[in-house]
Amino acid sequence: MAFRKPDEIAEAAIEAGMKKIKLPLPSLLVLGFLGGAFIALGYLLDIRVIGDLPKEWGSLSSLIGAAVFPVGLILVVLAGAELITGNMMSVAMALFSRKISVKELAINWGIVTIMNLIGALFVAYFFGHLVGLTETGPYLEKTIAVAQGKLDMSFGKVLISAIGCNWLVCLAVWLSFGAQDAAGKILGIWFPIMAFVAIGFQHVVANMFVIPAAIFAGSFTWGQFIGNIIPAFIGNVIGGAVFVGLIYFIAYHKKDRSRKEMKQVS
């Protein structure tokens, strides 16, 4: 499987960020909806797979669920969609390279976040609630338990957990930029995403599905949901824009530019 060098991945990420800014509004709206829906479908698959497993399996059942969750991000990357957590890295890198403005970044992040929320709520309401995929038997119990675990954490703990989450998610996106074929992209995405789910980190878009799914089932409140989403979003920004985007921009983009300048001098 062909794979780009890190400095080439950095340039690919910056180029991807610029392309995201240039998307026409109708495309951005539709792709943002799909991004939220795809992640929600991945989480729904997770719940349906592990909901009926024996409790005695303990963390093994969590690992099995984590192993199927990456389907969501694979759909985002290969089928095409806009996901705010990935944009926190690529669009930020375009900003760091001075190819876009802060205003353009803010507009992109705002629209994609709103559409991700709508997509995730769509899956939670129509598939989870109306069809009953998260509201019957052990699946309801699992949905509520997962949502409870997200909501029980303090603001600070959610924020820190979200940093770790998007560090791994954006590393998955980074690896997908590096791979030059579908198999390589799938492999690059799979393991970092499986890791964040198995660990139990906080992902803002995933939470936009699982917490509302529990709310539609009669548990928790929208106020609790908002109280979770705010620190999860902030932490995801730090994890994606700083721990991946900024660090790799410093490590590889400037180094690449200095090499070009040295060649011009020589």
From Swiss-Prot:
From its record, what is one biological process in GO terms?
formate transport
Do you know which Pfam families this protein is assigned to?
Form_Nir_trans
What are the alphabetically sorted keywords of the record? Cell membrane, Membrane, Transmembrane, Transmembrane helix, Transport
By its UniProt entry, which NCBIfam families does this protein fall under? fnt (TIGR00790)
- Give the primary localization class: membrane
GO MF, one term, reads: formate transmembrane transporter activity
Protein family (similarity comment): Belongs to the FNT transporter (TC 1.A.16) family.
Q: Which organism is it from?
A: Bacillus subtilis (strain 168)
Record-annotated membrane-spanning stretches: 25-45, 64-84, 111-131, 158-178, 186-206, 209-229, 230-250
Q: Which domain of life is it from?
A: Bacteria
What's the protein's topology in the membrane? Multi-pass membrane protein
Q: Which Gene3D superfamilies match?
A: Glycerol uptake facilitator protein
Gene Ontology CC terms, in alphabetical order: plasma membrane
Q: Where in the cell is it found?
A: Cell membrane
Q: Tell me what this protein is called.
A: Uncharacterized transporter YrhG
